[in-house]
């Protein structure tokens, strides 16, 4: 019996790295897991839709339950559909873990607007989109929920990462507001 038996988790950026590790551990602990990942490289370029499915295959091979999702978390409506898909497929959603991210590192004087926007969109807007749609479900269901948002010590100012630092610091602020706002609904 695992600590997450009967729970349903959605993990963004779950195709590789930290997100993959979290998805696999949550499944090992008994959660059904929605594995969200575009399958892009670290810079957010290209796409391999098989990346999310490969993690689901690992989960299922170990006896767990998984569902692959390759929608971009930067797309508000697609994230809403992803949350609904989790609920339709597994009957509910209990946990959201926002890990997805990309890097476009440059010194501020070398960074263009597109590099700024791409990183902020994935990290900050993507976290907002997922939290927004999941929190509506948590509020309406009235059984609580968990939202886990990943930030980084780079939020405090890492040279060559003005976009990343701003996005990660924004996630800290968003998370504080969510904690203060959603506690009354049992969401922590």
Name the predicted role of every residue range.
Residues 2-34:
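Canonical Rossmann dinucleotide-binding motif of NAD(H)/NADP(H)-dependent dehydrogenases/reductases
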